[in-house]
UniProtKB/Swiss-Prot annotation:
GO terms for molecular function: ATP binding; ATP hydrolysis activity; proteasome-activating activity. Pfam families: AAA (PF00004), AAA_lid_3 (PF17862), PRS7_OB (PF21236). Gene3D superfamilies: 1.10.8.60, Nucleic acid-binding proteins, P-loop containing nucleotide triphosphate hydrolases. One of its GO terms (biological process) is proteasome-mediated ubiquitin-dependent protein catabolic process. Residues 1-15 have a biased composition (Basic and acidic residues). ATP binds at G220, P221, P222, G223, T224, G225, K226, T227. SUPFAM superfamilies: P-loop containing nucleoside triphosphate hydrolases. Residues 1-31 are annotated as: Disordered. This is 26S proteasome regulatory subunit 7 homolog. Keywords: ATP-binding, Cytoplasm, Nucleotide-binding, Nucleus, Phosphoprotein, Proteasome. The keyword RNA-binding does not apply. Belongs to the AAA ATPase family.
Length: 438
């Protein structure tokens, strides 16, 4: 074996580049940006900026819209805060519902007032207010929440209202406008004077020193547009709209119908402006009589409560009341007097121009020929209501479907007139006296 000094000269010299490969230097920010730019197109930066702007706009829209409604009524899981909810539940103790029957005022300070509460089936207590309640929040006769230890008032509660009464409030506005109601131009103007003008321009009535009308009766044959006009009113105004069917107030047990009417007006008084629409009022508003058996006593009690709420000892407030019926001659005189019902609007049969307008309204969404003579079809439908004219349009569409055509022609409408008007005369909903007068 050769000595060490001999074979060291044959050893391959160490390359500094290989050492650098084994221990590479760390990358700085410029190198990282350069690596990120590899395999990217010329518009990558612009697309990334547009994506960030889109996400920011979408986030603002979601924050503005809020939580979407779900079938379960729960918020999305991303909005849950279980820890905070548990802490809040541990801090807040369950309360007992009581009624404040009397307020004992203190001459020195209102904060030292005493309150007499009545706990149902327990006893009456004289208590004070909790730390979170102001003396101005509590009134005599209202429901309050009390703690279980000292019975101190911790929370003012809203009045108790039957859920069936709460469900009468119309949440979503109907899609019917005044332009969708044909043949009722004069009736719509009189209706808007009573409903919309006092809500939009109350100063006119104040200057004249008169109270605006608060009750209106819509009467006429079936199918002339009474309920349709009420739906248009609900679409037009921003006031709370409550729809009541007369038969809903006819209850089995004594006093239930009167209680529902009372709670209905209590709920209406809590609103800034409210419109109550009683459809088919003849179900509870018939003339009072004694049949000897007492079968209609409960219905009469319900009507008496309605009469009292309309114009009784307590003021009605900013509540407009609409009634609709096709039998005005059967209603009680006390219900029809001015002060309770200030204006009566008759919905009669439409004239020739009104019938043509109604046909155009119902045919607006149909696939029809352009050269249909609506005045001719309207002239062939004398003494017909708006509902019967709508049936004519529906039957014309059925004739077109039966013939496997994509559009309805004038002949289809003429055949529909023959079927609806001529074939259903014995089932006509028009009153006899109106047929005679026409």
């Amino acid at each position: 074996m050769p000595p060490k000094e001999d074979w060291e000269k044959y050893q391959k010299p160490v390359d500094t580049e290989e050492e650098n490969d084994k221990n590479p230097p760390p990358l700085d920010e410029g190198d990282i940006e350069l690596l990120k730019s590899y395999a990217t197109g010329p518009y990558a930066r612009e697309l990334a900026a547009i994506k960030e702007d889109t996400e920011a706009v979408l986030k603002r829209i979601n924050d503005t819209v809020g939580i979407k409604e779900s079938d379960t009524g729960l918020a999305p899981i991303s909005f849950w805060d279980v820890a905070a909810d548990r802490q809040r539940m541990s801090e807040e103790q369950p309360l007992q519902v009581a009624r404040c029957t009397k307020i004992i005022e203190n001459e020195q300070s209102a904060e030292k007032n005493a309150y007499v509460i009545n706990l149902k089936q327990i006893a009456k207590f004289v208590v004070s207010l909790g730390e979170r309640v102001s003396p101005t929040d509590i009134e005599e006769g209202m429901r309050v929440g009390c703690d279980r230890n000292k019975y101190a008032i911790q929370l003012p509660l809203p009045p108790k209202i039957d859920p069936s009464v709460t469900m009468m409030q119309v949440e979503e506005k109907p899609d019917v406008t005044y332009g969708d109601v044909g043949g009722c131009k004069e009736q719509i103007e009189r209706l808007r004077e009573v409903v919309e003008l006092p809500l939009l321009s109350p100063e006119r009535f104040v200057k004249l020193g008169i109270d605006p009308p608060k009750g209106i009766m819509l009467y006429g044959p079936p199918g002339t547009g009474k309920t349709l006009c009420a739906r248009a009113v609900a679409n037009r105004t921003d006031a709370t709209f409550i729809r009541v069917i007369g038969s809903e107030l006819v209850q089995k047990y004594v006093g239930e119908g009167a209680r529902m009417v009372r709670e209905l007006f209590e709920m209406a008084r809590t609103k800034k402006a409210c419109i109550i629409f009683f459809d088919e009022i003849d179900a509870i508003g018939g003339a009072r009589f004694d049949d000897g058996a007492g079968g209609d006593n409960e219905v009469q009690r319900t009507m008496l409560e309605l009469i009292t709420q309309l114009d009784g000892f307590d003021p009605r407030g900013n509540i407009k009341v609409l009634f609709a019926t096709n039998r005005p001659n059967t209603l009680d005189e006390a219900l029809m007097r001015p002060g309770r019902i200030d204006r009566k609007v008759e919905f009669g049969l439409p004239d020739l121009e009104g019938r043509a307008h109604i046909l155009r309204i119902h045919a607006k969404s149909m696939a029809i020929d352009k050269d249909i003579r609506w005045e001719l079809i309207a002239r062939l439908c004398p003494s017909q209501t708006g509902a019967e004219l709508r049936s004519v349009c529906t039957e014309a569409g059925m004739f077109a479907i039966r013939a496997r055509r994509r559009v309805a022609t004038e002949k289809d409408f003429l055949d529909a007139v023959q079927k609806v008007v001529k074939g259903n005369q014995k089932f006509s909903s028009t009153a006899d006296y109106m047929n005679m007068s026409s």
